[in-house]
């Protein structure tokens, strides 16, 4: 409940020191100063009586949070302080707004970008997310400044920053050619990354599974990562192979971090394919060993056993070189077509389905949405075709040449999801975007990733405790990107805050019915303004563009 107009009911009993002082180096200590010098101020808002979790991973404490303008200006007992508005948080948790370090809020095509089509970002706000970082998987806008200016001109409901994509940079210089760059081309790509970092990118992302990034060798990525490192950026990667080549791909990521001298992050960390189930233990051990050797290596994940991407991921890399006409000619050539089909069968068997064609579900075929929601098995049955991997490969090729589709792939094991989640070097990210209900059948992570962690993995299963989960969704990603004034509840930090019911917060989106908003988040403030009030979306869009060049402090 929110009450306003009680400007005389509080008299300030705090000062500069009445707050939680966060120890950045330790990342997990918080303290209060109980006898500060007095300093009078009137607050715009006080969040009163909630269990406050500062984002460090420390236990919560019943405190009040005072806000003036866009900043937190006091934390403590503010029961006598003057304020224009009181937000009653008794019985609720008060936490930093969550930061999605892997977001598809903006896509390369503006017309399909949720942030521009649905700038209020309701599906994020209802999970407690106040900041999204775009440009993942090697794909971003270029120039970066063009994107950030466009976002600034679109009042948005959440904060937004971006990485610069390796695939984007490579395509700018080399198109979709499957070869190594010349010295001049490599220099041009390095220059593009340098410019993007100067324009505010937070680092370099790669998608070495996708075209044209898959055509790059490790040395190329190291060279571009050095340009990001020069501006205190990070390297975040969709691994070259998340299936049978998982461990070698993590070794490559570590080598990039070592060679370029920058922090690295394995994004949407998973072990994909039945033959790889359980391999997360070895994957995490590789990251632990890297950290022990002084290489800063972390990961993020979404809390599901299914992934989602375009069906072109089923094709051999070599078959996707060049423009659409070149790819179509390749598929029309009998010899090359046979090789392509064999490659699709191998990928379906070894990584994406085993021999179970219900594991692949079509999410969006924009050219024929009657196909949305069908499994590959169901697709074959619709056309009265044999339910075999070979028939499925033929249909996949037909889907791609007809216009392409995105799909959901049920390829992971719950044991790996939980093991990766527990690891202290793992933070939470959605790999989702901004949606409103529509004809697509997207991955439920778009609507539920962060709420699912709290509802399922904290409350129901006990995989994480509540303070640790909050840390993995707020301060941990903030620190990863050098944001010393977001992702935490501290005096001087921006007032990006979620107030939620820890006993009710839960995801409602399912794979069968994904367009369902999460529940249990009561209030959300973005830069001190109410974006969600008493569970209802406001018309206020107080989100801001975040640039790495505006960081107050570098990464700890």
Language model regions located:
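Active-site neighborhoods of metal-dependent hydrolases
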Residues: 163-164, 172-183, 187-211, 225, ...
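Divalent metal-coordination and catalytic microenvironments
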Residues: 50, 65, 70, 91, ...
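Divalent-metal coordination cores built from histidine and acidic residues
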Residues: 89-94, 98-206, 225-226, 291, ...
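Divalent metal-binding pocket/active-site signature
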Residues: 195-253
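C-terminal cap of metal-dependent C-N hydrolases
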Residues: 418-425, 430-431, 498-544
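Histidine-rich, glycine-flanked metal-binding segment
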Residues: 38-46, 52-97
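Acidic, glycine-enriched loop/beta-strand segments at the rims
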Residues: 36-37, 52-64, 404-417, 461-470, ...
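Bacterial N-terminal signal peptides
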Residues: 9-23
